[in-house]
Amino acid sequence: MRKRKMSKKKKKTIFSMVIILILVIIGGGYFILNNNDLAKKIKEKVEVKKLKIVDQDSKTRPYAVMINNHAKARINHAGLDDAYIVYEAIAEGGLTRLMAIFKDKDTDRIGSVRSSRPYFLDYALENDAIYVHHGWSPQAQSDISTLNVNNINGIQESSNDFWRVKDKKSPHNMFTSTASILKIAERKGYATTSDKKSVLNYIDGDADLKEKYGIVEGQIESTLTEGKAINATKIVIPHSTLQTVEYDYDENSKTYVRYARGKVQTDYITGENIQTKNIIITMCDNYTLADSEEKGRQGLKNIGTFDGYYITDGYAIPIKCEKESRTAQTQYKDLKGNIIEVSDGNTFINICPQDAKIEIE
């Protein structure tokens, strides 16, 4: 039987279909590769936008560590460069004490660690942090119990986890580490994860105060009513007649170098200057507590709405600092009532008296 020859028309049709199929395969491959490249670019873009100072997706519970800021202890500061927030407030004798907040850091030496004061609990609680200290005042001891604060008191712990450095003088030589804090927290059965959001409203990159709020020439008085930014390359904060803190702006690093009573503060392990990207000033009054020991211990009137300043990248704006209760998170707002955006970087929060003569220039 003779095979029928395929017509030219049919051959042409099949050839066309083969060509179309090849083009579809090539086009599909190109589409897939192109989309993979696009997906990769989108992923890279998302990763670039992730904050550097703290992982906001992390559920790790922070640690709040009390840090000695006595004149003889400042030369022993260690680990502050790993803290993403540092609070500073008055203590007895006109001196200040620090509380450093750590999260997702492996810091070998933090200190020098000092005793608790009751109002620092308010800021540990608003961060849902495990509170770390070495000793306590009677008021702090009572409040830790009443408020059910998850705390670690170094006096009650092993010298392997809270240790004194022999070449430094006591009581300014007590140190701990994040590894020790985690070990003790797990032993005590404390939660080591938290769903609480950050106290600060961070943005990716720098908060451009000049662009967002406009700028007004002059000193502090110029910005109090208008809410605009002023130049802020030098900041002086008198916590008391005995304790003045100064920050000088370094344009190269776009951070502020910290000074105490005219001397630059450094990390004694690294030798690096202590610097901060952001400064927040909250102005609320302190008062002397009446107790039988008469040591001049202080209380803080920090519940309510208070004036303050937010400072970053060489500019400052006036803000309102609102705290509704001891456990409530402080809200930092501009004069229009909007939560301020905070630059991606570490922050020192200075809590000073309402009548303090703040200098910003």
Tell me the role of every PLM-derived stretch:
Residues 16-28:
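Hydrophobic membrane-insertion alpha-helices, especially the h-region
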Residues 1-13:
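N-terminal Lys/Arg-rich, disordered targeting/topogenic segments
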Residues 10-13, 39-83, 92-361:
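A surface/extracellular/periplasmic glyco- and lipid-processing/surface-interacting theme
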